[in-house]
Amino acid sequence: TEMFGIKYPIICGAMMWLCKPPLCAAVSNAGGMGNLTAGNYTTEEEFRGAIRETRRLTDKPFMVNITLLPSIRLTPDHYRMYFKVCAEERVSGIEFSGTPVDKAAGMAAIEGLKKAGVRLFHKVGSVRHAVHAEKVGYDGIYAAGIEEGGHPLNDDVTSMVLVPRIAES
């Protein structure tokens, strides 16, 4: 809440096909953190338009989710485009899920986004991934257990187990 000046410590989960400008803005307007799913957009014009539409619907902060997984229809060119647009539009934050950005796109991508003032978060499903995210320099992590849905890990660790393990590490 302090980092973004939002009223409630609630971040809208990134949901493909659902987290578009109306839902993102509604969550932000209600005091939480809206989350625009980049994967809904395959061109720069569509993606930039969605960010700008969200800004027309709310004057509150919101973030963008970028899922870096080889199993979805997006390519490294899409990821580079998302990074570029997020930096140019100076979105409040990005929630990354899947492959860590430093491994998928290199540290230059992280440095460019941070230089633009974008806060970076990584959604993690294991202690190992949380430790890696901290070492890389993300601004924060989300611990996402198996109940989160759409999880790429094969273990059955819930958030109630994962959060204390990460806090202890």
Give the residues covered by each predicted segment.
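Active-site entrance/lid segments in N-terminal catalytic domains of soluble metabolic enzymes
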Residues: T1-S169
